[in-house]
Regions:
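Charged, amphipathic alpha-helical regulatory modules used
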Residues: 1-63, 425
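Conserved catalytic cores of very large enzyme subunits
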Residues: 47-51, 57-427, 448, 454-608, ...
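Conserved phosphate/anionic-ligand binding catalytic regions in large, soluble enzymes, centered on
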Residues: 178, 182, 226, 425-442, ...
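Long insertion/accessory domains within large nucleic-acid-processing enzymes
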Residues: 604-657
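Local sequence-structure signature of Cys/Sec-based thiol-disulfide redox active-site neighborhoods
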Residues: 670-704
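Thiol-based oxidoreductase modules, predominantly thioredoxin-like and allied folds used
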Residues: 706-718
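Structural micro-motif
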Residues: 723-732
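Non-catalytic, surface beta->alpha helical segment in thiol-disulfide oxidoreductase systems
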Residues: 735-756
Length: 756
């Protein structure tokens, strides 16, 4: 002990901590040459530390089961898609164990404490999986369902009915390997050739689509949930697909996707009619959540399908709309993520595929949400605010990198067999950092004290979002992973973080009215009771939502259904043509009576029979009965002011408020960035090893007898940068010092056919 004390001058008031003594003992043993004794002592210390921490990692099995069965824990309603059931109990039990495993065995103390203390919220701790994923429907059509040793394998579907069954099974299987939404892109485009090949009647098509919709709404997922499914529908044949051979039964047909417009319309009509009809009691289908592409060539005329689409929008609020008119997105983005080249590690990419969906072969490995109101409350000034947010972003980014490393190891070890078979890697998946309560952060900030309806708060929020974007670029350089900034949907996070904050800081400002259940406003949304003028809200949100790279959506909350389909179409068009935000919905409230079916608006009792009715509204992003919502979201619904479309007035917008026309997939340039050396004609085909369409592009050139040079884009960055190549396949034509760039296989095929 003398040796130890002689080495340690940190004794104060004749007291010394146990940790200081043990540190000194370790040091003395090592310096004295007692290596074996030192090793044993270190192991002993670690064992004692685990015993001391045992109480924090032990779970009380009785409390876990009782809290669910007796509904004493608010987390029973944490997710409104999980109904009270034995499946929900099993999910609750396993989730508690898995969350404990993440926090005590995988994440370090700093990460674990930040979550437990509600500085951040790590989503989906109850799952040892990634968050969300988009899948290639084309791959399923080409390869069939299976390929896993010891499991049943189905050959590529040759008929629409078989494909619909395979899609239901595929989504159900994948949902068990992921925590969140599963998505297919170009649903109508890829299904249309099956209709054409078998010359199906409309009734036959509708029966197939009905089987798909009912199938994905069956609670087959863990926790007695239906698979959380999202589909994007093109409505018109996309440019990057229209010239490609259609695929049925795993084989190329003698017609292209562009030849299937009539059949595509049949698929869309069948889907919408089924969604409008609802189930046997008139209840709207929860899944799949459809996202429709609003492009410049969208046909707004009074077609039968347009009437159906906007009737579904007016009545149930089912669809999401992707704004390809004024946003910085392109329709082909949902299919090109795995082909995009990472020219700049600091470039923040958009996560495509809709609000909950993901583009093909992309998605998110995990989400961490930062508690913005608490940061503002604890900060004396802006400088402190940014220091605190940087620290929490560092913790969040590190936690996501750890999660990516862990689930990648588990993927390679076979824990997610179907994900390994159809995806193979998480390289194209994002690490997602989100935020909540920016409105309340501005109210708590001592240097603002105003909500987001004021210009000072809006300007500060823009600065914060841009600061976070820069920080994410730093993490991409540091870790080599994709990072994105999300407007977190925050179904349960909004309540959990506010509940913690009120308990620790009674005078903190939350979104709730005095004496109401605490909650925070999602991301940088406006106060839910601010205005009934939708365009007033859009004018503010358009400046903020465009700074996010995923998860952002504007919900047009309505008190009841719109009077007719024309009113819905006019509103959807007006938003797309005058605003830049990428995703939006029309979201009416409606009710369901078991005897009389659909009722417009919020009606807790049926006006016809007096029976109790279910009131449905959109929670974060999907429709669920309000009775299933957690207390925080229920409080938000009570305070929500719905928009009055009749009294809403659009303000004049300056030309600079909207973006310029997007660059075409085929472009010609002669500037420095695209200049060619010499004047001899050359043709380059840029490809990557993971690109699914590069072979098709090469085949088109060879069929037309066009000579070309293959450039491996991953190994020739100098040429990639010289010619401004952003994705594979890309064809570069050098003619007389001019450079023409053709991106995607469809444009390359069209060029080759013109040369024949």
């Amino acid at each position: 002990m003398y040796q130890v004390r002689k080495r340690d001058g940190k004794i104060a008031d004749s007291l010394i901590s146990v940790e200081d003594i043990q540190d000194s003992v370790e040091s003395v043993l090592i310096q004295a040459g007692y290596d074996d004794v030192a090793k044993g002592y270190i192991l002993y210390r670690k064992q004692r530390e685990k015993i001391r921490n045992l109480n924090s990692t032990l779970l009380d099995y009785k409390e876990i089961v009782d809290s669910y069965v007796k509904v004493t824990d608010w987390r029973v309603k944490e997710n409104s898609t999980v109904t009270y059931s034995v499946g929900g109990l099993i999910l609750s039990n396993s989730g508690a164990i898995t969350a404990n495993y993440w926090l005590s065995e995988i994440y370090d103390d700093e990460i674990g404490k930040a979550h437990k203390n509600a500085d951040i919220h790590i989503h989906d701790l109850s799952m040892l999986t990634g968050y969300c994923a988009g899948w290639s429907l084309k791959q399923l059509i080409q390869e069939g369902l299976g390929g896993i040793p010891g499991r049943i394998t189905s050959a590529p579907a040759r008929h629409l009915s078989v494909l619909c069954n395979q899609m239901v099974n595929f989504l159900g299987i994948m949902q068990n390997e992921w925590a969140g939404a599963q998505a297919f892109s170009s649903f109508d485009t890829y299904l249309a050739p099956f209709v054409k090949a078998d010359r199906l009647t409309y009734d036959e098509v509708k029966k197939c689509i009905e089987s798909f919709i009912y199938g994905v709404n069956i609670p087959s997922r863990w926790g007695t949930q239906a698979p959380f499914s999202n589909i994007t529908l093109d409505w018109t044949i996309p440019d990057d697909l229209k010239n490609l051979p259609a695929i049925v039964g795993g084989k190329e047909m003698d017609f292209t996707y562009g030849d299937c417009k009539e059949e595509m319309d049949m698929v869309n009509r069948a889907f919408i009619e089924t969604m409008i009809e609802g189930d046997a009691e008139g209840r709207g289908f929860q899944y799949p959540i459809p996202t429709y592409s609003i492009t410049r060539d969208f046909d707004w005329s009074e077609t039968e399908n347009n009437k159906l689409l906007f009737e579904m929008t007016a009545k149930y609020g089912t669809p999401y709309f992707s704004n390809y008119i004024n946003s910085d997105m392109e329709p082909g983005d949902v299919r090109s993520m795995c082909c995009r080249l990472r020219l700049d590690l600091r470039e923040l990419r958009k996560k495509s595929g809709g609000f909950f969906g993901s583009g093909e072969s992309t998605g998110s490995v995990g989400v961490v949400t930062i508690n913005m109101p608490r940061i503002a409350y604890l900060s004396e000034n802006e400088e402190q605010f940014y220091k605190k947010i940087d620290r929490l972003m560092d913790i969040s980014a590190r936690s996501l990198h750890i999660k990516r490393t862990v689930i990648t190891k588990l993927l390679n070890e076979g824990l997610y067999p179907y994900t390994k078979r159809y995806l193979g890697t998480f390289e194209n998946h994002f690490s997602t950092i989100g935020l909540i309560g920016m409105n309340e952060a501005c109210l708590n900030a001592k240097w603002i004290r105003k909500d987001l309806t004021h210009s000072e708060a809006q300007a500060f929020t823009k600065d914060v979002l841009n600061h976070m974007r820069e920080r994410l670029s730093d993490y991409q350089e540091m870790y080599g992973d994709l990072y994105n900034l999300e407007a977190t949907p925050a179904e349960s996070t909004t309540y959990r973080l506010a509940k913690h904050d009120v308990a620790q800081f009674p005078d903190i400002i939350t979104a709730a009215e005095p004496n109401g259940t605490p909650y925070y406003t999602n991301s940088s949304h406006l106060p839910v009771g601010y205005t009934d003028d939708v365009f007033e809200a859009l004018d503010i949100q358009d400046e903020l939502q465009t700074l996010y790279t995923s998860g952002t959506v504007f919900h047009t909350f309505l008190g009841e259904k719109l009077p007719n389909w024309k009113a819905a179409a006019a509103l959807v068009r007006k938003i797309a043509e005058n605003y830049r935000l990428p995703y939006y919905t029309i979201s009416p409230t409606y009710s369901i009576c078991r005897n009389h079916g659909y009722l417009s608006g919020e009606q807790h009792k049926c006006p016809y029979c007096g029976e109790e009715a279910e009131v449905y509204s959109r929670i974060t992003g999907y429709y669920r009965p309000i009775k299933n919502w957690n207390d925080g979201k229920t409080q938000e619904f009570k305070e929500r002011k719905v928009y009055n479309i009749t009294n809403s007035r659009m303000r004049p917008k300056t030309p600079s408020a909207l973006t310029a026309d997007p660059v075409s997939a085929a472009e010609t340039a002669s500037g420095a960035a695209l200049s060619a050396d010499g004047r001899s004609p050359r043709t380059f085909l840029f490809t990557t090893s993971t690109c699914p369409n590069c072979h098709a592009a090469a085949a088109s050139l060879e069929k037309a007898h066009i000579p070309y040079e293959v450039i491996d884009a991953e190994k020739n960055w100098d040429l990639v940068q010289k010619y401004g190549v952003m994705q594979a396949p890309t064809l570069i034509l050098v003619r007389d010092g001019q450079v023409t760039k053709l991106a995607n296989a469809s444009n390359i095929k069209a060029y080759a056919e013109r040369k024949v």
